[in-house]
Each structure stands twice: as C-alpha cells, then as structure tokens.
Amino acid sequence: MVTFEVIKFKLLNSANYGVPQKRERVIFIGKKKNGKITHPEPTHSENGEDRLKKWISIKEAIWDLEDKEEDINFNHILTTHNSEFSEKIKNTPIGKSVFGNYSDAFFKAHPDQPSRTVKENHGGVFVHYKNNRVMTPRELARLQSFPDDFIFEGSKSKQLVQIGNAVPVGLARAIAEHIKKLL
C-alpha cells in the first residue's frame, strides 16, 4: 500500500484549461515525500482577464459540424426526431429545457458559452443550439476536448457513455503536465 505524506485537493473547472465545458471536479494530488504541492495554473478565464485566453464556447468547438452530413465512422451520428418533438425543440429558447422544469435534460445549449457538464446519462441531454436535434457523439466528444482522430467504438448509446464518463482531455493533459513538473 502506498502512503502519501502530503495531499492537496482543489476544485478545478475544465473551462479554465481550454475545454469548451464548465465541468468542475475536485482533483487530489499527493506525494510520498515532503515538498510543495500545487495544481496547474489556468490557461483560460471567462472573460480572458489576467492575460489568459477567453473560455472556448460551444460554437467555437463544433461550428464546423453544424451542416455536416452523418458520418458513422466519425461518430457524427444524427438522431431523427418525430415532427412533434422537432417542433418542441424548435420552440425551446436557448438555455432552457425542451421539457420545461427539468434543469438537466434536453437543455438547449447556449452557443456563446462553454457547455454544462457532459454526462453519460440519457443521450439527449444537449440539444443543438441551431439545428433541431440532440448533439451527436462527435459534438459531445469535442465538448470533452477529444481530438477528432479519437474514434469511439460500439453503439451510439455506448459511445455516449464513454464520452460522458471521461475526464475532459484538456483537463487531464493540464494535470498530467503539471504533475510531471512536480516530479
């Protein structure tokens, strides 16, 4: 069993590390020996203050997929909705749920902000800000900062679970690079 002598934890927001998503996670960093423990410094901020880059918005992350045709090999799998549901989506304002009172389901994404936390539960959490449909696995993967050459395997629902359960790539990279400097 490994025993750590020094442990420090901090709440980190993925958007502060170049991820187009406001996903907050408590990150623990520990060392076996005495020494200073720090967490990675942010590279981005909400308004780009303190010489940091501005947070990346949903639109910046996925704009080029708006009119892209379905491509199963690229994980850009479109969902076909019935006309009644498509009309509901169309009439839902940005920042609101298609179902009104549900704060976390079928939320119409705000294009000019980072997204809410991408989760694995029910694949229709994010409604596209422009198109009357839920976001594709590839769009959600981009919100998790996965590179386009990372291909998810399995059914669409299994892809959504993999994407939603992942640590955002940009945050993981920032933490790993910082820990490497501490060694």
Label each residue range with its predicted role:
Residues 1-108:
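Class I S-adenosyl-L-methionine
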Residues 65-183:
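C-terminal target-recognition/interaction regions appended to catalytic cores
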